[in-house]
Amino acid sequence: MPRKGENKERKDAKRELLISVAVKVFARKGFHASKMQDIADEAGIGKGTIYEYFKTKDELFLAVYDKWMDDYEAAMNKAVESHSNPITTADAIIDTAIEFYETHAEHAAILLEFWAHALRSDDTHFLERICQMKSKLAEIGSSITKKLIKLKAFTEVDVESFARLELGISDGIFLQWILDGKSYPLRDAYKFRQSVIGAGLMTTGFRKVMSVKTNKRLKEGFIKKKKK
């Protein structure tokens, strides 16, 4: 007879499977056009089995976003904990964001649908989850910025305003990359953005140290130029 621990492991594994299958269906058909039966068919199970784990399609949709954000937050925390220098920490955070967006590039429509659904839905859990994650990212960004200011790498700046602006820029770069057909490396776009922001916020002394790398990026850009 299976023990309670084994039953929980099986249930957790089944739940993860259903989330993975739901991602495929939502990506293919869109959230609103997808039915629980579609997900059941894709998973090769009865529709009733899904309801043992998720009461509604909305609950399953939220579980998909939760899974992605939990993984993203864990990766961000790991990046912060692995570095003591704020400069290398900032680089690690950017690398983590790039990796997340590249991993979920094919699911961009789901992310956009989630944001749109959060604004329309009467269920406040959707918008609360987005705000929760954004607040966490803003907290990390603020902490790093404060350390860069203390290190005299950055000039004085309103930390909270800058952290919020960074969140919008980050999402915007990802969206523009998708709209541009992923025609350039996302990493190059992020590094260019890093140079633009750095050029404005770096102290005079630190700007001199970083000038060769920063100026090179600013001149080259990230969009491949057509040969004349």
Task: Give the label of every model feature segment.
Residues 124-151, 161-164, 191:
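Amphipathic alpha-helical packing segments from all-alpha helical-bundle domains
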Residues 17, 21, 25-59, 63:
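Helix-turn-helix
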Residues 1-13, 205-228:
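N-terminal intrinsically disordered/low-complexity leader segments
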Residues 99-103, 117, 143, 147, ...:
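Amphipathic C-terminal alpha-helical segment
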